[in-house]
Regions:
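Hydrophobic alpha-helical segments
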Residues: 1-168
Length: 168
């Protein structure tokens, strides 16, 4: 466990409450940390901004305080308002796809899939879907264990968001 802890600090600079909780089970930690590998796969064709907007859409739809606030921070620090950002058609399709992945049964209407298929290859859509699925899994993990929001994220909390009160 110590080696995994040191690796997180080396790669990500800090141990968040979520990562600290995940480190109780190294296989669980490694499974959810594949999020980073998938992010690195989709970022070249989405761009940093759309990766954050996609992840924020999923996390907001799932009402995950930890993840939605994390992405609110990224969006805010990039100079945008996380509650009022402008999207072009491509971005709109990707953000809507994220919201759909977060809904029960993750059904994606044919029309939305056609919009994605017009822009992305099959390989890219598969990577985007897997990335979104890991984002959903991360949301479920944080919500199920009521992982506390990290203090550094408090200023980015959405006004009506209630503090997490878990012990994890």
């Amino acid at each position: 466990m110590r080696a995994a802890h040191d690796e997180v600090v080396r790669e990500h600079g800090r141990i968040t409450n979520m990562k600290r909780t995940l480190l109780h089970s190294p296989p669980a930690f490694h499974a959810l940390m594949e999020w980073y590998a998938l992010r690195d796969t989709v970022q070249p064709f989405l761009g940093e901004r759309l990766v954050s907007l996609f992840s924020h859409a999923i996390s907001t739809e799932n009402d995950c305080l930890v993840c939605s606030t994390f992405f609110r921070q990224i969006i805010t620090e990039s100079g945008e308002d996380p509650d009022r950002f402008k999207l072009d058609e491509r971005e709109e399709a990707v953000v809507e796809f994220g919201r759909r992945l977060a809904k029960p049964f993750a059904r994606v209407p044919n029309e939305l899939f056609a919009r994605l298929a017009a822009t992305f290859s099959d390989e890219q859509i598969v990577a985007l879907t897997a990335f979104g699925a890991l984002m959903v899994a991360t949301n479920v993990f944080n919500n199920a264990l009521d992982v506390d929001l990290d203090g550094y994220l408090d200023p980015y909390r959405k006004d009506e968001a209630t503090p997490a009160k878990g012990t994890a």
